[in-house]
């Protein structure tokens, strides 16, 4: 299950206290959150997605959000748990397809040091 950042205050906290990483199409804000634990005490990560009106009309923005959500969902098992992540879409994302979006997302997650290769048990930096 993918947990979401929903409230404005959650986004603000990540923006202010988190660390940012950027590439051409995305900006990633990351904040370690020790309170992200389920009933069994297992840590999980939360994600928030922000797409500005500068990117395009509502159809384009929704498409971008769907692409980012799906990329995160499919790579969730390879991301270290216990973090709040906010992805902010930049203008060039409107012209990118799923594979380019996923590549940009993985690139930022690796830059942040959150990518964990399950097969090899290796944390990428």
From Swiss-Prot:
Alphabetical GO biological process terms: tRNA 5'-leader removal
Keywords: Endonuclease, Hydrolase, Nuclease, RNA-binding, tRNA processing
Pfam families the UniProt entry points to: Ribonuclease_P (PF00825)
Gene Ontology molecular function, alphabetical: 3'-tRNA processing endoribonuclease activity; ribonuclease P activity; tRNA binding
Highest taxon of the lineage: Bacteria
Alphabetized InterPro entries for the sequence: Ribosomal_Su5_D2-typ_SF (IPR020568), Ribsml_uS5_D2-typ_fold_subgr (IPR014721), RNase_P (IPR000100)
Enzyme class at the top of the EC tree: hydrolase
Catalytic activity field: Endonucleolytic cleavage of RNA, removing 5'-extranucleotides from tRNA precursor
EC id: 3.1.26.5
Description of how the protein assembles with itself and partners: Consists of a catalytic RNA component (M1 or rnpB) and a protein subunit.
The family this protein is said to belong to: Belongs to the RnpA family.
NCBIfam families named among the record's database cross-references: rnpA
Name of this protein: Ribonuclease P protein component
Lineage, highest ranks first: Bacteria, Bacillati, Bacillota, Clostridia, Eubacteriales
């Amino acid at each position: 299950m993918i947990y979401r950042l929903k409230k404005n205050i959650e986004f603000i906290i990540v923006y202010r206290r988190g660390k940012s990483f950027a590439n051409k199409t995305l900006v990633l804000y990351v904040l370690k959150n020790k309170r992200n634990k389920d009933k069994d005490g297992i840590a999980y990560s939360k994600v928030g997605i922000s797409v500005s009106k500068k990117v395009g009309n509502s159809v384009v923005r929704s498409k971008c959000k769907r692409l980012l959500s799906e990329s995160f969902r499919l790579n969730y098992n390879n991301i270290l748990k216990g973090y709040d992540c906010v992805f902010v879409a930049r203008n060039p994302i409107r012209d990118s397809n799923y594979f380019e979006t996923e590549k940009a997302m993985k690139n930022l997650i690796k830059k942040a040091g959150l990518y964990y290769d399950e097969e090899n048990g290796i944390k990428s930096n």
